[in-house]
Amino acid sequence: MSMLCYTLIIAFLIGIWAAPKSEDNVPLGSPATSDLSDTSCAQTHEGLKTSRNTDQRHPAPKKAEDQELGSAANIIVDPKLFQKRRFQSPRVLFSTQPPPLSRDEQSVEFLDNEDTLNRNIRAKRENHPVHNQGEHSVCDSVSDWVIKTTATDIRGNMVTVMVDINRNNEVYKQYFFETKCRNPNPNPVQSERRGIDSRLWNSYCTTTQTFVRALTMEGNQASWRFIRIDTACVCVIIRKTDNF
């Protein structure tokens, strides 16, 4: 009886030892572990390839600032456009920085060399009603360098004015020197002008315009056009009676 028990116990232990091991208990370096590692690596590699293909098909959107800088840098202007002196105007200036006004606000002076596109300019614009002692302007005016994005051309059409200009891999801005009335008031009753006899005349100040050549966009090409800019403040008088 005891021999039979020993035989059954030994057979039971042999059966347990010979049973197949689970994948969780497989030691490292065994064939089963290698198969699992190869399978997971292959799946990971396929996932990386899929994500790369997705990124190539759907690139990340660019920021608005990057798009604006890129569009400004892509507008390349042929340097030959600046070789003709008849296109130059003292009221139009291309510069990498805002042009300075003089300290007394009575003249405008900008000086630079030819290598930086800014031609030598020495222009004076009146900005104060007092020219000399005893001389006064009928209307007060103010002048300043401005940047324009749109303007009216000589044909009366609205055109796009170039702001940033790429020349020789350097970006310049197009500035316009404008003069306008300081306090325009078309109502002659509310405001009188210097030296105008209000008993005989109605008067008011108004800003006048003239045409200058500026670089504008025509499709994808840069071209010179005549555009309107403010250039002076004048006094308009109207006779009240026709007695004379």
UniProtKB/Swiss-Prot annotation:
Q: Is the keyword Nucleotide-binding assigned to this protein? A: no
Start and end residues of each stretch annotated as Disordered: 47-69
Taken from the UniProt record, the cysteine pairs bridged by disulfide bonds within this chain are: C139-C205, C181-C233
One Pfam family linked to the record: NGF
SUPFAM superfamilies tied to this protein? Cystine-knot cytokines
GO CC field: axon; dendrite; extracellular space; synaptic vesicle
Role: Nerve growth factor is important for the development and maintenance of the sympathetic and sensory nervous systems. It stimulates division and differentiation of sympathetic and embryonic sensory neurons as well as basal forebrain cholinergic neurons in the brain. Its relevance in the snake venom is not clear. However, it has been shown to inhibit metalloproteinase-dependent proteolysis of platelet glycoprotein Ib alpha, suggesting a metalloproteinase inhibition to prevent metalloprotease autodigestion and/or protection against prey proteases.
Pro-peptide positions?
19-125
State the family it belongs to.
Belongs to the NGF-beta family.
Entry's InterPro entries?
Answer: Cystine-knot_cytokine, Nerve_growth_factor-like, Nerve_growth_factor-rel, Nerve_growth_factor_bsu, Venom_nerve_growth_factor
Q: Which UniProt keywords apply?
A: Cleavage on pair of basic residues, Disulfide bond, Growth factor, Lipid-binding, Metalloenzyme inhibitor, Metalloprotease inhibitor, Protease inhibitor, Secreted, Signal, Toxin
State what protein this is by name.
Venom nerve growth factor 2
Name the major location: secreted
According to its UniProt entry, the protein's GO biological process terms are: cell surface receptor protein tyrosine kinase signaling pathway; modulation of chemical synaptic transmission; negative regulation of neuron apoptotic process; nerve development; nerve growth factor signaling pathway; neuron projection morphogenesis
Task: Give the molecular function GO annotations.
Answer: growth factor activity; lipid binding; metalloendopeptidase inhibitor activity; nerve growth factor receptor binding; toxin activity
Q: Where is the signal peptide?
A: 1-18
Record's subcellular location: Secreted
Where is it expressed, tissue-wise? Expressed by the venom gland.
From which domain of life does this come?
Eukaryota
Q: How does it assemble?
A: Homodimer; non-covalently linked.
Basic and acidic residues biased stretches: 47-66
